[in-house]
Each structure stands twice: as structure tokens, then as C-alpha cells.
Amino acid sequence: EFTIYGVLIAVGALLGMGLVTLEAKRNGEDQNRYLDMMLISLLVSVAGSRLFYVAFSWGFYKENLNAILDFRNGGYALYGGLLFGFFAAAVFCRITKTSFWQSADIACPGILLGQAIGRWGNFFNRESFGEYTDLPWAMQIPVSAVRSGEVSGAMRDNLLTINGISYIQVQPIFLYESLWCLLLFLLLMAMRRKKKYEGELFMIYLAGYGLGRFFFEWFRTDKLYIPGTKVGISLVISAILFAVFMPVVIIRRV
């Protein structure tokens, strides 16, 4: 059974891989090697993103074990996918005796393009939203489609009823992140001929995405938390990415 969520993820992945192979050709690299690397990394990242999501949503899944294998309705964590995917790419580069940093520089614009497109899957899956808003571009979601713990008091106080169905009106965090990824994509495409060292584009990607995601996570209400705390795991990872890689980018640029 196909879902719009799955279709958008697939479209983003295909366009991203297409761009990576074109960039590989432009750099005089073996396109087939990059295609192999991306396919392997994609498969590993899908599994990793699911495992990451389940691990940090264990309170729900331990009572609904069958839901762990329900891959049709979302339940994927991007950072889990990136972590597992980059690890797979690093292993692939080591086996093929090629530079991971060079490969990552070539791949990251395609990854960002895929992220920008794939985030729209969250719209159709009613995920990645923030607090109540009455802005014209507010995301409207049926209350029945949202877990009760993700519906705040402000959302309940401002329900919108259409044809007898109650909707919450919330910030479309997925949209903001999609636009941020598109902006970073354009930045990296503009810089790819001006980079000073291997790994520069990749580190800009990590620092830039971490910066944007850090702010978006503050407003997101359906975030994943570190067990036993009210601290979002993506918030922590985003802060680490920015704090580690942005100084390196600045210092090596100077």
C-alpha cells in the first residue's frame, strides 16, 4: 500500500541521488560508486531512522509492539537516519579506499534537496508541528489524528470546527524546516566551486542544519524526548552539531 508520505520520501531520495551522481560526474568521480554508496546509505538510514524513533518513543511502542513494524504511517527520526546513513557511507568509503570527506562534500547538496522534499511528507502524515497559531498558513489537523499528549491547552482553547470535525491550528514546523533545507541547498550549490578543503561543504551542512533545527525544535510540540526528561533529543544533537562544526568552519576559512 502506497502512501503520500512514502511517495514524497521516495521522490526526495531519487532526486537527491540524481543530483549526487551529476555532481560526481562534474568532479570527475565514478558515478557508479556514488550511486552504490547512496543506495546502501539510504537503506541503512531508513532502518536507522525507524530504530531511533522507536527507541525514543518506547513508552508507546512497548505497549504496541505490532506498531513497530508498521512503516506506512510515519514514525521516522531524521537524525537517526543521518547518523546511520553517514556511518554506512564512512564504512563504504573505507572499504573502497576513497575519501569520505570528498564524498560527503559531493553528496550533501543532494541530501539537502531530498530533505527539503521529504519534509512535505510530514504534512500529509500530520507530523512535525508546533504550538497554536492563527497565521494564514497555519496547519490544520483533526484532533482525533493527534496523540492527546501532543495537544496543548492553547490548541484546545482555539479549536476550529468544520463540518462537525474539530481541528487544531498549529505552526507548520515541517514547512519552516523544508525552506531552511532549501536555503542551505542553494548556499552549498553556490559554494561548491569555492571550497577550500575537503569536508568544508559537509561541515557547513551539519552546522547549518543543526542551527536551523535547534530553533525549530523549540517550537515543535511532537518532539522526541530523552527518556526521563523533558529535553528534546533533536535539540541536544542540533546544539552539538552547531557547537562542534561551526567553529571549525570559521577557523579553517580564516
What are these regions (language model features)?
Residues 1-254:
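A feature for loop-to-transmembrane-helix boundaries and adjacent hydrophobic helices
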